[in-house]
């Protein structure tokens, strides 16, 4: 039996041992040979290994029984899965309830985690699955008790806008995030619907809440291509923003003195 076949047998057995609700609402996913890893965003740039564990801050109706590493196939998926980066910038690192001692440098490290097989829950187990495309790396055998991680990109927030579009014609207020992304090595999917992007510098404009007229088939819990715009930028433009206080929008809140410094990564 080859190693891949053994992994498949092991993860099938692992799923069979889960609770009925999990078994009914989970899918086994095999790694794509052209993109054999998932992504995980963190303010901690010193993670060597990721250990599957129960969710510490589960969302509404999120599964609380399966130990896992929360991952997604794209940067936007990671952001939707847990937008801790904007939260930290607005309210301070410790306000999020983390006990980790991390030198927060005002940005997110994007890790790649290679895998053979993983699990894909549906909305019954992860309520924001339609936006995050969350996957789980689970401990289904001895080789998957830990997953190795490698930093391949860095993400910073350059601007956040709230735009009131009114209440006529079913419009929704816009929340617009502007991120800058440095892809350092390998290729990275920025959005769930596009091909991976090569190393370089990118500006991401993300309309987290669409300011559009809603229609009968519009689902605010599902990602659509109109929500994201990606533009390649120069290294000098990226560095120019990185050296500023990030972002200026948040510096008047008064209780995030940690942010009053330049980027150091």
What is the role of each PLM region?
Residues 2-265:
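NAD-dependent ADP-ribosyltransferases
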